[in-house]
Amino acid sequence: MELQLSETQALIRDTARKFAREVVAPRARATDREERVPADLYAQMGELGLLGVNLPLELGGAAAGAVSYALAMAEISAACASTSVGMAVTNMCGELINAFGTDAQRKTYVTRLATGEAVAGAFE
């Protein structure tokens, strides 16, 4: 059985890999030491579409599916586990609000999560 990534999956993987290697990895030690993922990393992940991989296009997501999400998570996780947890929680919250929230909640929160304007988490 031969499995190949779709063009979208390969693009998301490659985008996440480049970002992880060039931006996330060099800051991983400081991120862990400070016990906080820098806000600008979330903003950059949002710009790249990494915070809404499974969210609908109309809400700022990529609508790219679970395989694309797993590929992106693997790349970010390899560079910095802390950053990947923040990415995972933000994606998860966006997906839950999209699935179970009202239209008003979707418009208010999901778009902000997908773009990195807002970040999900309360781990203080």
Where are these regions (language model features)?
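Intrinsic disorder at enzyme termini
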Residues: 1-8, 12
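Glycine-rich flavin
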Residues: 25-124
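A non-catalytic, amphipathic alpha-helix used as a structural packing/dimerization or gating element
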Residues: 11-22
